[in-house]
C-alpha cells in the first residue's frame, strides 16, 4: 500500500500564532535591552558627576603623608568656578589656576568638552552652587553634591595658638612682637595675605577660609625668625593649629 506524504501548508491561524509569539519575544528582548541601556547611562552619568565634583572641590580619597592632597579648583583659586569651562581653561588669567582639573575619558579631544555631557548626551547642569546635576534623560534628575553647603567650601575657620618653647603665651607686653601671616587664594586669581596678631593668651582666629592647603607663617619680629606651617582645610571644619616657637623668648 502506497503512503502519501502530506504537503499541507500552515494554516492562517498557525501563522498568526507564530507571529504573535515572535512579537512577544521581540518586545521582551527590546525591553530588556532598553533597561540595560538605561542602567548603563545612569551609571555613566553618576560617574561623570563625581568626576566633575572632584574637579571642583577635590578628591578626599587622594591622600599623601596621611593628609588630604587634592582640593581641586576651589583649593587653588579660592572660589567656585563660574562654569564648567573654567575647569579646563583659565577663566581670566588667574595665576593660581593650575588646571585642567578634568580630562575627557577614553578619547580626549583638543576641545576637552565631552565631560560636560551626561549618559544621554545632554548637558550637565552647574550654576555655581554646591551641586552638579543631570536631567537623567528626562526621567529623573541625578544630583551630586560638592559639599553639604557652599559655606562648607568657602567659609571655614582656622584657630591658632602661639607659645614659646616653654609653653608661655606672649602676654600683653610681647603680643605685638609676633604676627601671623596666612596666605590664601582670593577667588579672583591672586593670593591674599591675612595678617593677625595674637591676644595676650596667644590665640588668634581666621574666618572665611576656603578649603585647600594654605601657608601659615609665624614671624617673631625682633629677630625676624619665621616658622612655616602648611594648613589643610577640609569642608565644614574648624582647624586648630598649635605653634611653639623655637626657644624661650618671653
List each language-model region with its residue ranges.
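Membrane-proximal N-terminal amphipathic helix
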Residues: 38-67
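A short, amphipathic beta-strand motif
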Residues: 156-166
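A short, solvent-exposed beta-strand micro-motif common in secreted/extracellular proteins
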Residues: 210-224
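N-terminal single-pass transmembrane signal-anchor helix
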Residues: 2, 6-37, 41, 48
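Short, ordered, surface-exposed loop/turn motifs in non-cytosolic proteins
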Residues: 166-190
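Structured interaction patches on ligand/partner-binding surfaces of diverse proteins
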Residues: 221-250
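Short, glycine/small-hydrophobic-rich surface segments
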Residues: 56-112
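Short, acidic Ser/Thr/Gly-rich low-complexity loop/linker segments typical of extracellular
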Residues: 185-204
Amino acid at each position: 500500500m502506497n503512503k502519501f506524504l502530506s504537503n499541507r501548508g500552515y494554516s492562517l491561524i498557525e501563522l498568526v500564532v507564530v507571529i504573535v509569539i515572535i512579537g512577544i519575544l521581540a518586545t521582551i528582548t527590546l525591553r530588556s535591552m532598553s533597561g540595560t541601556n538605561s542602567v548603563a547611562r545612569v551609571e555613566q552619568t553618576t560617574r561623570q558627576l563625581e568626576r566633575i565634583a572632584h574637579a571642583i572641590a577635590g578628591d578626599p580619597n587622594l591622600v599623601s603623608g596621611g593628609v588630604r592632597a587634592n582640593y581641586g579648583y576651589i583649593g587653588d583659586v579660592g572660589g567656585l568656578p563660574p562654569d564648567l569651562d573654567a575647569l579646563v581653561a583659565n577663566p581670566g588669567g588667574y595665576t593660581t589656576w593650575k588646571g585642567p582639573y578634568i580630562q575627557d575619558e577614553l578619547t580626549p579631544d583638543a576641545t576637552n568638552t565631552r565631560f560636560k555631557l551626561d549618559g544621554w548626551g545632554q548637558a550637565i547642569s552647574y550654576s555655581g552652587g554646591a551641586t552638579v546635576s543631570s536631567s537623567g534623560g528626562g526621567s529623573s534628575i541625578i544630583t551630586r553634591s560638592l559639599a553639604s553647603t557652599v559655606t562648607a567650601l568657602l567659609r571655614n575657620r582656622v584657630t591658632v595658638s602661639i607659645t614659646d618653647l616653654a609653653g608661655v603665651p606672649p602676654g600683653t607686653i610681647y603680643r605685638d612682637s609676633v604676627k601671623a601671616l596666612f596666605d590664601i587664594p582670593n577667588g579672583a586669581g591672586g593670593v591674599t595675605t591675612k595678617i593677625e596678631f595674637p591676644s595676650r593668651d596667644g590665640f588668634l582666629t581666621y574666618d572665611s577660609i576656603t578649603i585647600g592647603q594654605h601657608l601659615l607663617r609665624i614671624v617673631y619680629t625682633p629677630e625676624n625668625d619665621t616658622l612655616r606651617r602648611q594648613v589643610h582645610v577640609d569642608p565644614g571644619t574648624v582647624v586648630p593649629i598649635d605653634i611653639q616657637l623655637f626657644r624661650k623668648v618671653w
